[in-house]
Amino acid sequence: AFSGILAEADIAAALKACEAADSFNYKAFFAKVGLSAKSADDIKKAFFVIDQDKSGFIEEDELKLFLQVFSAGARALTDAETKAFLKAGDSDGDGAIGVDEFAVLVKA
């Protein structure tokens, strides 16, 4: 899903680092997976991969399954992780993360 944007080895390393429940940290994940260093264009491409229902927003249910977008065998985020991730990214308080909010979150 991320071919041409992210390296498989980086994805594997980033997922391994947050295998344990409640160990997910979006800043660490985006850095390890190599997304923080990418161009605005690549970050946008990644957003549209994560936006599974193509609504133009990443909603709470999509955040919960965020890691599984990177690898089908990955765990779901815990409720606490999901809520913290949403709170960090949803700067306008509409309950979802838009493409511009996502870009800010990745570079945070």
UniProtKB/Swiss-Prot annotation:
GO molecular function: calcium ion binding
Chain sites annotated for binding Ca(2+) 2: D90, D92, D94, A96, E101
InterPro entries (UniProt xref): EF-hand-dom_pair, EF_Hand_1_Ca_BS, EF_hand_dom, Parvalbumin
Gene3D superfamilies according to UniProt: EF-hand
Alphabetical list of CDD domains matching this protein: EFh_parvalbumin_beta
Pfam families: EF-hand_7
Keyword Ribonucleoprotein: no
Residue stretches making up the EF-hand domain: 38-73, 77-108
GO cellular component: cytoplasm
Residues reported to bind Ca(2+) 1: D51, D53, S55, F57, E59, E62
Entry similarity comment: Belongs to the parvalbumin family.
Other facts noted in the record for this chain: Is regarded as an important allergen.
Name used for this protein in its record: Parvalbumin beta 3
The species this protein was found in: Merluccius australis australis (Austral hake)
